[in-house]
């Protein structure tokens, strides 16, 4: 079996693709993959590290306002389609899967026009422009939020969930918090603002230090590498809480999640998939800087089921953050109920569901 995959720009499009690749490899050890991305995108570095064959095309995203750049983008799209067709003709895949980001546009479009079975996987509650465009041409659209269904041709939509959920659930032996000098007997909160960190979350954490010092729970706080030095200087000046460990980045984060009781994070699709699969209660602070404010819609899908406390960035403060944490961590019943509600929204077999869609197409 041969499968071509495309998706990139952010980890939210790349990691679900890699999780799906692992699922197929588990079932078919001799499967061959080709990943098509951009030369300068995050996907090249991540995918090649996994020893997956990688080819690149040149493509940029559309601007939302009319501009000459969009004319250039159309030209790049057409060139990308031509190049994708040559890659696909050489590789001869049984199916092509796009996981979002503008790079998958020319690749999946080319595959559809060549008559190759195609799937797009939409991770968010509000779909991106590329997947909406591709939905007219592909065989199936796999979604992770019921809210996304109305944006696609209904006869093509299949609810699969995010394969990243299957990956975190499959981790049998997690890493120990003792690596960071944290107690394995205390309730633990993980705070992080995405791969690059988030300045507003960092500000709130710094501001809540005096109150945090008096709490019996502990915090593992990830600043993001670009913010680390500035945050450490401020914590040194203010006096950091003894029950908090601060790191710039957490490699292999999924391996630590089973030791975490509550998460404070943005509301990206990967985060939602992971915490719902594991049943981890959360305080979600959606990024307002994403397309169509889709993170807030993601967050509300948990908030409306009382599976998360949602704080908008405009209302975030140290006081509000510690209040939200206290509501969950200091009440065993609340913690237990939120964990159960969160887990009820998870799709731990998402990778297997997406694989089933692929198998159906190949018949």
Curated annotation (Swiss-Prot):
The keyword Glycosyltransferase applies. The keyword Glycosyltransferase applies. GO terms for molecular function: glycosyltransferase activity; UDP-N-acetyl-D-glucosamine:N-acetylmuramoyl-L-alanyl-D-glutamyl-meso-2,6-diaminopimelyl-D-alanyl-D-alanine-diphosphoundecaprenol 4-beta-N-acetylglucosaminlytransferase activity; undecaprenyldiphospho-muramoylpentapeptide beta-N-acetylglucosaminyltransferase activity. It is found in: Cell membrane. Its EC number is 2.4.1.227. It is a peripheral membrane protein. UDP-N-acetyl-alpha-D-glucosamine binds at residues 10-12, 124, 195, 295. One of its GO terms (cellular component) is plasma membrane. Pfam families: Glyco_tran_28_C, Glyco_transf_28. It catalyses: di-trans,octa-cis-undecaprenyl diphospho-N-acetyl-alpha-D-muramoyl-L-alanyl-D-glutamyl-meso-2,6-diaminopimeloyl-D-alanyl-D-alanine + UDP-N-acetyl-alpha-D-glucosamine = di-trans,octa-cis-undecaprenyl diphospho-[N-acetyl-alpha-D-glucosaminyl-(1->4)]-N-acetyl-alpha-D-muramoyl-L-alanyl-D-glutamyl-meso-2,6-diaminopimeloyl-D-alanyl-D-alanine + UDP + H(+). Keywords: Cell cycle, Cell division, Cell membrane, Cell shape, Cell wall biogenesis/degradation, Glycosyltransferase, Membrane, Peptidoglycan synthesis, Transferase. Disulfide bonds: none annotated. Pathway: Cell wall biogenesis; peptidoglycan biosynthesis. InterPro entries: GlcNAc_MurG, Glyco_trans_28_C, GlycoTrans_28_N. GO terms for biological process: carbohydrate metabolic process; cell division; cell wall organization; lipid glycosylation; peptidoglycan biosynthetic process; regulation of cell shape. Belongs to the glycosyltransferase 28 family. MurG subfamily. NCBIfam families: murG. Cell wall formation. Catalyzes the transfer of a GlcNAc subunit on undecaprenyl-pyrophosphoryl-MurNAc-pentapeptide (lipid intermediate I) to form undecaprenyl-pyrophosphoryl-MurNAc-(pentapeptide)GlcNAc (lipid intermediate II). This is UDP-N-acetylglucosamine--N-acetylmuramyl-(pentapeptide) pyrophosphoryl-undecaprenol N-acetylglucosamine transferase. It comes from Bacillus subtilis (strain 168). The lineage of its organism: Bacteria, Bacillati, Bacillota, Bacilli, Bacillales.
């Amino acid at each position: 079996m041969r499968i071509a995959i495309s998706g990139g720009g952010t980890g939210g499009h790349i990691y679900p693709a890699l999780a799906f690749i692992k699922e197929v490899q588990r079932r078919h050890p001799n499967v061959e993959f080709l990943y098509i991305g951009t030369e300068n995108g995050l996907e090249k570095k991540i995918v090649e590290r996994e020893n997956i064959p990688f080819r690149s095309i040149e493509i940029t995203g559309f601007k939302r306002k009319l501009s000459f750049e969009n004319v250039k983008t159309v030209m790049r799209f057409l060139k990308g389609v031509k190049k994708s067709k040559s890659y696909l003709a050489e590789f001869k895949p049984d199916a092509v899967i796009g996981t979002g980001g503008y790079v998958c546009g020319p690749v999946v479009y080319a595959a559809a026009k060549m008559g190759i079975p195609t799937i797009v996987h939409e991770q968010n509650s509000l779909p991106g422009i590329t997947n909406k465009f591709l939905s007219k041409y592909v065989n199936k659209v796999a979604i992770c939020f019921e809210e996304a269904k109305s944006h696609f041709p209904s006869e093509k939509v299949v609810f699969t969930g995010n394969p990243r959920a299957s990956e975190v659930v499959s981790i049998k032996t997690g890493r120990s918090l003792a690596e960071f000098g944290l107690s394995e007997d205390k309730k633990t909160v993980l705070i992080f603002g995405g791969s690059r960190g988030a300045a507003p979350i960092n500000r709130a954490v710094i501001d809540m230090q005096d109150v945090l010092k008096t709490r019996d729970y502990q915090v593992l706080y990830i600043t993001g590498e670009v913010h680390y030095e500035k945050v450490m200087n401020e914590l040194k000046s203010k006096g950091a809480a003894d029950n908090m460990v601060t790191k710039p980045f957490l490699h292999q984060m999924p391996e630590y999640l089973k030791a975490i009781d509550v998460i404070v994070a943005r509301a990206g699709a990967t985060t939602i998939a992971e915490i719902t699969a594991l049943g981890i209660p959360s305080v979600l602070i959606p990024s307002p800087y994403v397309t169509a404010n889709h993170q807030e819609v993601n967050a509300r899908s948990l908030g409306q089921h009382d599976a998360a406390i949602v704080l908008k960035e405009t209302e975030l403060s140290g006081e509000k953050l510690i209040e939200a944490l206290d509501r969950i961590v200091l009440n065993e019943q609340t913690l237990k109920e939120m964990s159960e509600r969160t887990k009820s929204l998870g799709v731990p077999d998402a990778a297997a569901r997406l694989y089933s869609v692929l198998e159906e197409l190949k018949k």
